């Protein structure tokens, strides 16, 4: 009888731990998903890839395209939503395309999105002691190395795989 009670208690504790862990995993997944959707929406609304524009001036011409793609950002629109935007970081080969935030406080955007909502992913942001016009000798931009490969998550592959650089040069 005592063994049955102990087994039942262990079972309840085990199920409670599984439920608790599942809840937290769901919360993390949901947070990642919300952040991804927020930044995808920003990119769709405010970033225009020049290589995808239908420009009449280049139709029929033999002009060579540059080795990179330009991207036009509607900074006025972005700043109307959040005046802390100071730039946009874009690496086409790494799917890195995010607004760069600045508050002067290195911890403010660590866990806040562009919309100033709490999120594990936070934002990509400029070092608090840097100038917002990027005129410093060295400008430091912070961002998370996310497990779902968002933000700066894909940059780790440059260190892990020597061939990755060859196929993902900017």
Q: What does each model-identified segment do?
A:
Residues 18-170:
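Solvent-exposed, non-transmembrane regions of membrane-associated and secreted proteins
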């Amino acid at each position: 009888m005592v063994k049955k009670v102990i087994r039942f208690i262990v079972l309840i504790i085990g199920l409670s731990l599984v439920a608790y862990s599942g809840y937290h995993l769901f919360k993390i997944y949901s947070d990642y998903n919300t952040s991804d959707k927020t930044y995808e929406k920003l990119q769709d609304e405010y970033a225009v890839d020049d290589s995808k524009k239908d420009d009449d001036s280049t139709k029929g011409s033999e002009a060579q395209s540059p080795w990179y793609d330009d991207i036009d950002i509607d900074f006025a629109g972005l700043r109307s939503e959040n005046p802390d935007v100071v730039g946009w970081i874009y690496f086409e080969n790494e799917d890195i395309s995010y607004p760069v935030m600045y508050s002067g406080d290195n911890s403010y955007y660590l866990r806040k999105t562009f919309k100033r909502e709490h999120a594990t992913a936070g934002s990509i942001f400029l070092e608090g002691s840097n100038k917002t016009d990027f005129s410093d000798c060295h400008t430091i931009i912070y961002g998370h190395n996310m497990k779902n490969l968002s933000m700066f998550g894909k940059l780790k592959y440059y260190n892990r795989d020597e061939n990755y650089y060859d196929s993902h040069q900017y």
